[in-house]
Swiss-Prot record:
Pfam families noted in UniProt: NUDIX (PF00293), Zn_ribbon_NUD (PF09297)
Protein name per UniProt: NAD-capped RNA hydrolase NudC
Binding sites annotated in the UniProt record for Zn(2+): C99, C102, C117, C122
Name of the encoding gene: nudC
Residues annotated as domain Nudix hydrolase: 128-252
Family: Belongs to the Nudix hydrolase family. NudC subfamily.
GO terms for cellular component: cytosol
Record's function text: mRNA decapping enzyme that specifically removes the nicotinamide adenine dinucleotide (NAD) cap from a subset of mRNAs by hydrolyzing the diphosphate linkage to produce nicotinamide mononucleotide (NMN) and 5' monophosphate mRNA. The NAD-cap is present at the 5'-end of some mRNAs and stabilizes RNA against 5'-processing. Has preference for mRNAs with a 5'-end purine. Catalyzes the hydrolysis of a broad range of dinucleotide pyrophosphates.
Chain ranges for the short sequence motif Nudix box as given in the UniProt record: 162-183
Domain of life: Bacteria
CDD domains listed in its UniProt record: NUDIX_NADH_pyrophosphatase_Nudt13
Length: 264
């Protein structure tokens, strides 16, 4: 990152953890001097609506009002993913100021998203840490399996998800997570899509699966409730628009409807 100049212009991405500085629900746009950003460190990380998107290094004790990145989920996917990039990069820079190998300070690498140790005898280079997390929609005939997680207790019902463990494939993680959290066995696993998820540094890897056996028995530390829901019956509160979870649910409900049409 370099010192921002008063006449530098574009969109400005200021972050505090997974929150953004917004003005009337939008990123500030204009010259750096318009928002008193000159002198802070920043860099261009992409283009938004034909203008540069500047990432500003996190400002300690900033008195501006910040809003959760989740509030912008309805943005076009490419725009939301670009904001994800900024949030994840600032998290990476903030948590890797020192070399994890020798403890010396690090510098930002100019040619790529990376930091490098200042110690000439080390020069260890580190790249942004991305923690993959599988997410899966499970179908049984014309029904979908939805769970109310402990963190959403009494609220949203959604698909099952969990982090991939060391030495585990994505597919193995899906089978393990579904079995651990609900006692359900699955089959016909297939890839659906993915989504960057800067809370703070994940990537959601989406799958579809079919029921193979078992009865629901929830892992109470993680899951408050799990049920099979008929696709054409009233559904509980679902994840917000823009999430891969909702896309998985909507796609699975379509598959449920097709299954019922075939049966009749």
């Amino acid at each position: 990152m370099n010192a921002i100049q008063p006449d530098d212009a574009g969109y400005w991405l200021l972050t505090q953890d997974s929150a953004l500085y917004l003005i009337n629900g939008e990123l500030p746009q204009g010259k750096a001097a318009d928002f008193q950003l000159q002198g802070y460190n920043g860099m261009i990380i992409g283009e938004l609506n034909g203008r540069p998107l500047w990432l500003v290094e996190e400002i300690a004790d900033d008195q501006r009002t910040y809003f959760s990145l989740r509030s912008l989920l309805a943005l076009p996917e490419a725009h939301f993913n670009l904001l994800n990039r900024g949030v994840e990069l600032n998290h990476f820079f903030k948590t890797h100021r020192f070399c994890g190998k020798c403890g010396h300070p690090t510098d930002l690498v100019q040619q790529e998203w990376a930091i490098q140790c200042q110690n000439p005898s080390c020069s260890h280079r580190t790249y942004p840490v991305i923690c993959p997390c599988i997410i899966v929609a499970v179908r049984r005939g014309a029904q979908i399996l939805l769970a109310n997680h402990q963190r959403h207790k009494g609220g949203i019902y959604t698909t099952l998800a969990g982090f991939v463990e060391v030495g585990e494939t994505f597919e193995q993680a899906v089978h393990r997570e579904v079995l651990e959290e609900t006692g359900i066995q699955i089959q016909n696993l297939r890839y659906f899509g993915s989504q960057p998820w800067a809370f703070p540094n994940s990537a959601m890897i989406g799958f579809l699966a079919d029921y193979a056996g078992g009865e629901i028995c929830v892992q109470e530390m993680e899951i408050h409730d799990a049920q099979w829901f008929d696709y054409n019956a009233p559904l509980p509160e679902l994840p917000p628009k823009g999430t891969i979870a909702l896309k998985l649910i909507e796609h699975t409900l379509q598959l449920c409807a097709e299954e019922e049409r075939k049966a009749t």
